[in-house]
Amino acid sequence: DGAKQPHRVLVQVPDNFDQEKRCVVVAASSGSRGIYGAIAVAGAWGLPKGCAVAYTDKGAGTDYYDIDTHTGVRLDGTRGALGETLAFVPEVPVGMSGVAFKHAHSGDNPEADWGKHVRQAAEFALSALNRAYPEAKSFTFDNTRVIAVGISNGGGAVLRAAELEGEWLDAVVAGEPN
């Protein structure tokens, strides 16, 4: 709510995804690791088990903007110029120079929305599964097991997600949450 900068989400669906044993593992990256930061935590377990895996950078990713050259990171990870679709563009006061990082310079308070970001990643996974398997019964929180996983402040994010209303999570694994 009120965030100026988006959080990233990513979904991986394994070739052996079982539509009859529907499973989504949703993970929040720890620290400022970006969207790929939780692959070793969630993907390494969930994908071989046939689960789809959804990730969020929880609004604290590694996106940066070079104030001096007016360049930043595109959504595909390559560098781009101001005016292109960049993952993060800060409000820059006149005369400022240096590099701005999304986590520190977005002007948002991403921690306030960590739980929502985890839930949105899970919702994105269900939407992706509905697009990938249009002939299947619709994927919903009621018919798909959802397990949230995170370590460090990624663990804190999944605990915040567990505090949200509704019965959308089936399990939470939080290692050393903060």
Task: Locate predicted features.
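Catalytic-loop region of hydrolases
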Residues: D1-C23, S32-G43, P48, A100-D108, ...
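Short helix-terminating capping/connector loops at secondary-structure junctions
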Residues: D18-K21, P134-T144, E167-W168
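Hydrophobic or amphipathic alpha-helical targeting/insertion segments
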Residues: V24, S30-E84
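Alpha/beta-hydrolase active-site loop
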Residues: A81-S97, K102-K137
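Short, hydrophobic alpha-helix immediately C-terminal to the catalytic nucleophile
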Residues: R119, L159-E163
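Gly/Ala-rich beta-loop-alpha elbow adjacent to hydrolase catalytic centers
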Residues: I147-V158
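Active-site nucleophile loop of the alpha/beta-hydrolase fold
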Residues: V173-N178
